[in-house]
Design a protein with these regions (language model features):
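Elongated, mostly alpha-helical coiled-coil "stalk/stator" tethers of large membrane protein machines
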Residues: 1-179
């Protein structure tokens, strides 16, 4: 995430939080970001310098007025005017981080070889909340290469309890013992 994205996203969060709109704006900002990420041609069109800024902003108005809160629309128009619309995903990420910080939420990803059952996911979620004392936004991911066990990534801290990791450790121990 760039410093520009951090600054713009953080500023939007401050405004939305002050107005009690932080949750609504978060949802709309992430939705608009996903939409624009899925339409590279439209995003490119909004970034062409030869098209006057006024026309590019009018395109945003036409597409999003009445669909999103005015703060989100004006934020996108501001980024468009500054030639920084491609920073929108970073801005949304910065906004999300500020939101999570304000509400005591940690993002966690559990990677396993097979899909976790609903019960396993619920138990893991409960255990993580108990251990951290924070609310956990838990996502699960399947990677057959882990072979078994679970690898947790909690905001950049990795806890690797996978079979693959244990085998790698065993391999290193055997290699060190034979030297």
């Amino acid at each position: 995430m760039t410093e520009t994205a951090r600054m713009y996203g953080g500023s939007l969060y401050d405004l939305a939080a002050e107005e009690g709109l932080d949750e609504r704006i978060l949802g709309e900002l992430e939705g608009v970001t996903a939409l624009l990420n899925g339409d590279a041609e439209y995003l490119h069109l909004l970034s062409i310098p030869s098209i006057p800024k006024k026309e590019r902003c009018a395109l945003l108005d036409e597409a999003f007025r009445g669909q999103v809160h005015l703060y989100v629309l004006n934020f996108m128009k501001l980024l468009c005017e500054k030639g920084a619309l491609r920073e929108l995903p970073g801005c949304a990420r910065a906004y999300r981080l500020r939101y999570n910080e304000a509400y005591g939420i940690l993002e966690a990803t559990a990677v396993s070889a097979v899909p976790l059952t609903a019960e396993q996911t619920a138990r893991l979620h409960e255990k993580l909340e108990k251990v951290t004392g924070k609310h956990i936004d838990l996502k699960t991911k399947v990677e057959p290469a882990v072979l078994g066990g679970i690898r947790l990534d909690i905001e950049g801290t990795e806890l690797d309890g996978t079979v693959r990791n244990r085998l790698a450790g065993l391999r290193s121990s055997i290699a060190a013992a034979t030297l």
